[in-house]
């Protein structure tokens, strides 16, 4: 197998895992030349001649063959500085009195509601935004700086949680998956 392999995916969510996958694949197939486009907009994969695409959520276009690879959890996180200054929310209702980030989907322009587990159900939880952005890395940096709480993709948050730069909050309300 040789030749170009056109790969697309969201810029920030998949960066922590994508390189390892590409590196391993190209190690097995050295004739492959990966052409990687990381961006948060969802283009037309057929017109763009995409071979492999990664996305969170539903298939971006009718006629695209999609497979669920893995579930992504959404985790409410805060930096230790935020918690020292403002404390941790003790309940979902307490989120209303905290500074929260919200993410605006770059493809639709809509604010993505926070998703939380309530019993056996998943609910959308409105929060009062202290910052709104369409860039996951900017949102991550605002959370790391201790300015806001954020609901971040587990792939994004995990290395910072392990390094104790972020603290997961309301863990009983983490939805089972966002995929």
Regions found by a protein language model. Name each.
Residues 44-47, 59-179:
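C-terminal regulatory
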């Amino acid at each position: 197998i040789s030749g170009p392999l056109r790969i697309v995916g969201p810029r920030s969510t998949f960066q922590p895992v994508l390189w390892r996958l590409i590196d391993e694949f190209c190690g097995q197939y050295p004739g492959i030349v990966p052409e990687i486009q990381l961006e948060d907009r969802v283009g037309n994969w057929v017109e763009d001649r995409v071979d492999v695409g990664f996305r969170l959520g539903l298939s971006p276009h009718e006629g695209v063959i999609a497979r669920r690879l893995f579930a992504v959890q959404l985790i409410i996180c805060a930096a230790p500085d935020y918690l020292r200054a403002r404390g941790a929310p003790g309940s979902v209702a307490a989120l209303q009195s905290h500074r929260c980030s919200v993410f605006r989907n770059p493809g639709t322009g809509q604010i993505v509601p926070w998703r939380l587990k309530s019993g056996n159900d998943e609910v959308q939880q409105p929060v009062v935004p202290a910052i709104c952005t369409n860039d996951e890395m900017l949102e991550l940096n605002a959370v790391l700086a201790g300015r806001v709480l954020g609901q971040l993709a587990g792939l994004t948050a995990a290395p910072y949680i392990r390094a104790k730069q972020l603290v997961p909050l309301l863990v009983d309300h983490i939805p089972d998956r966002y995929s």
